[in-house]
């Protein structure tokens, strides 16, 4: 997705050779028009897969996920990082390690909102080592829901997340692939 790649190159801030900050349009302040295009692109890629729910994790995955849900005309369901007092019935849970925050969180999804009747598209803002997407896939499997694929806004292709997801048998669609952050510069993967 050319517009997204341009935004990543122009507005992304390289913190170090493994961390890219995109707070100006994705992770803190959200460019709604860009996220609408992200959602539309995921819809075009997965529209024939029978998607019944978009599944993501709070917080940064919500913006692209809700825009995808809007285009699919299905609910957006996000895994919570803390169990609210209002969640009194059953839930699915898994542990997810955040590469950026270097922190492991237990995330939960209410059994009320995810079941074997669902076909989910998992959406996440970043793909580094794949732990968040694999954790969401684990939750979908616990619910006996079908996973149609994984939609990633920005993939750090120099890390092993994409490979791990494919090894799990998942279809992965990354809209912007970063080849390198070396030399304090964003270099994108050139698609042929």
From Swiss-Prot:
Keywords for this protein: Cytoplasm, Glycosyltransferase, Purine salvage, Transferase
EC number in record: 2.4.2.22
Primary residence: cytoplasm
Catalytic activity line of the entry: XMP + diphosphate = xanthine + 5-phospho-alpha-D-ribose 1-diphosphate
Enzyme class at the top of the EC tree: transferase
GO molecular function: xanthine phosphoribosyltransferase activity
Binding-site residues, 5-phospho-alpha-D-ribose 1-diphosphate: 128-132
InterPro entries: PRibTrfase_dom, PRTase-like, Pur/Pyrimidine_PRTase, Xanthine_PRibTrfase
Pathway: Purine metabolism; XMP biosynthesis via salvage pathway; XMP from xanthine: step 1/1
Gene3D superfamilies: 3.40.50.2020
Subcellular location as annotated: Cytoplasm
Binding-site list for xanthine: 20, 27, 156
Record-level GO cellular component terms: cytoplasm
A GO biological process held by the record: purine ribonucleoside salvage
Keyword Glycosyltransferase: yes
Role according to the record: Converts the preformed base xanthine, a product of nucleic acid breakdown, to xanthosine 5'-monophosphate (XMP), so it can be reused for RNA or DNA synthesis.
PANTHER family documented for this protein: HYPOXANTHINE/GUANINE PHOSPHORIBOSYLTRANSFERASE, XANTHINE PHOSPHORIBOSYLTRANSFERASE
Subunit (UniProt): Homodimer.
Family: Belongs to the purine/pyrimidine phosphoribosyltransferase family. Xpt subfamily.
Protein name in UniProt: Xanthine phosphoribosyltransferase
Native organism: Staphylococcus aureus (strain JH9)
Lineage: Bacteria, Bacillati, Bacillota, Bacilli, Bacillales
């Amino acid at each position: 997705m050319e517009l997204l790649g341009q935004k990543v190159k122009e507005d992304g801030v390289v913190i170090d050779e493994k961390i890219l900050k995109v707070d100006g349009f994705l992770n803190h302040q959200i460019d709604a028009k860009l996220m609408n295009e992200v959602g539309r692109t995921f819809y075009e890629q997965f529209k024939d897969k029978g998607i019944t729910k978009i599944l993501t994790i709070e917080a940064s995955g919500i913006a692209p996920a809700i825009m995808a849900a809007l285009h699919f005309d299905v609910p957006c369901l996000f895994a919570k990082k803390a169990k609210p007092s209002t969640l009194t019935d059953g839930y699915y849970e898994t542990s997810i390690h955040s590469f950026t925050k270097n922190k492991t969180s237990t995330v939960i999804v209410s059994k009320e909102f995810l079941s074997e009747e669902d076909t989910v598209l998992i959406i996440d803002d970043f793909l580094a080592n794949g732990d968040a997407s694999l954790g969401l896939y684990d939750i979908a499997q616990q619910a006996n829901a079908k996973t149609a694929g994984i939609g990633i806004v920005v993939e750090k292709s120099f890390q092993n997340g994409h490979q791990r997801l494919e090894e799990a048998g998942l279809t992965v669609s990354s809209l912007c692939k970063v080849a390198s952050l070396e030399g304090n510069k964003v270099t994108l993967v050139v698609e042929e």
